[in-house]
Amino acid sequence: MSKIYRHIAGGSDEQIGHIDPEHGYVYSARFGPDKYIGWVNYEKGYVYSHQLGPDKYLGWVDVTQGKIYANRLGPDQYLGQVEQDGKLYRHEPGGRDTYLGSLTDMHHPVEGAAALLFFFNDEEAEAGEVANNDDSADKTKGKAKSNKPSN
């Protein structure tokens, strides 16, 4: 099982989710049973968000380079990359990429894409933070808040 950790400067990294490699199911960690939020397609490198009706296609990973792209109207947006050792980085145009966290026991680069798209994608995270004790937080689609400091 791949475990997803958010980097905390000067402290222990926090586990925020995990991926079941047998089925590709993605779960958000919370108090009580973890919440199913989506799945990955290992053959194609695609990531899907679970929702009522058809699941939503979020993005994909270039398995040879570990580059992660979000699905957008027009050209897909480059978000960042996952390294072979499971380290996740957000792309910062004109600057050094930001280290976000890591995956332990990563089986395929698409697991890194799922971590970035579900837990570290600012655009998706603006909808709100995953409610740890409330299943009615469907508006968040399982996204957790970014680790960027708010002003």
Residue positions per predicted region:
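Long terminal segments
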Residues: 1-25, 56-151
